[in-house]
Amino acid sequence: MALREHEHEDQLSKEGFKHIYVWQDGPDTWYPDHVHPTATAHLIVEGEVTVTIKGKSRTYKAGERCDVPGGTVHSAKMGPQGCRYVVGEM
């Protein structure tokens, strides 16, 4: 059973993430290569997202977590049902 959103938020807070929020993207939303200045964590609640880092792609589904180190160039493409996720930023 996947954690509920508030449980994800609590988990990220305990890990030291300072800015925590829920985000939702529609079907097939695409974020081209970009960088976050600090580490980010994305805990998938519904749907899926494919994240590409250094030419390697991985799809994350509900119940999974994607961590991106600060300063890392990456892109993201939401699945056909979109994606809802809890984000933590340092």
Question: Model regions: which residues?
Answer:
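A generic "binding-loop/recognition-motif" signal
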Residues: 27, 37, 56, 72-73, ...
